[in-house]
Amino acid sequence: MNFLAHLHLAHLAESSLSGNLLADFVRGNPEESFPPDVVAGIHMHRRIDVLTDNLPEVREAREWFRNETRRVAPITLDVMWDHFLSRHWSQLSPDFPLQEFTCYAREQVMTILPDSPPRFINLNNYLWSEQWLVRYRDMDFIQSVLNGMASRRPRLDALRDSWYDLDAHYDALETRFWQFYPRMMEQASRKAL
């Protein structure tokens, strides 16, 4: 899962959106650095990552990547799940339009920015002003996201080519998304994530 899915599931679980978004920028034990609600959100994010990576649908989807891109398949798929969530948001969350949700999420996250790591602050400078969560529905933007990640981290250069795997398996990936994401929404609503 990437930014949008983590925020969405956190909202459904009544967990800290801030903690769920911040988690990838925090190493080790967060208890000494953040308030309890943010810590709980960080832990929820980590549980979701482990759960998602081990779902049969996600394991199967990783196998569709070519040898030269399979190493980055988990990252690429995380971004792709956000694409499908953004694209189908009105079906999955009909009572909370994506643009409104984005504003709500931004307000929640802004409360912790002063005490956040610089890389997280930098992400937030772009995430909200450039409307990433809404733009995830556009596959050209997904390609741009993957290229940007590859540019910032040369060891992830294969992300550039992983775009072709997404394109080749788009329909099958969308089917897998519909198989697992509604289940995760239900688990989040029951606070079982």
Swiss-Prot record:
<dbReference type="GO" id="GO:0008770">
    <property type="term" value="F:[acyl-carrier-protein] phosphodiesterase activity"/>
</dbReference>
<protein>
    <recommendedName>
        <fullName>Acyl carrier protein phosphodiesterase</fullName>
        <ecNumber>3.1.4.14</ecNumber>
    </recommendedName>
</protein>
<keyword id="KW-0443">Lipid metabolism</keyword>
<dbReference type="InterPro" id="IPR007431">
    <property type="entry name" value="ACP_PD"/>
</dbReference>
<keyword id="KW-0276">Fatty acid metabolism</keyword>
<comment type="similarity">
    <text>Belongs to the AcpH family.</text>
</comment>
<dbReference type="InterPro" id="IPR023491">
    <property type="entry name" value="ACP_phosphodiesterase_gpbac"/>
</dbReference>
<comment type="function">
    <text>Converts holo-ACP to apo-ACP by hydrolytic cleavage of the phosphopantetheine prosthetic group from ACP.</text>
</comment>
<keyword id="KW-0444">Lipid biosynthesis</keyword>
<keyword id="KW-0378">Hydrolase</keyword>
<dbReference type="GO" id="GO:0006633">
    <property type="term" value="P:fatty acid biosynthetic process"/>
</dbReference>
<keyword id="KW-0275">Fatty acid biosynthesis</keyword>
<dbReference type="Pfam" id="PF04336">
    <property type="entry name" value="ACP_PD"/>
</dbReference>
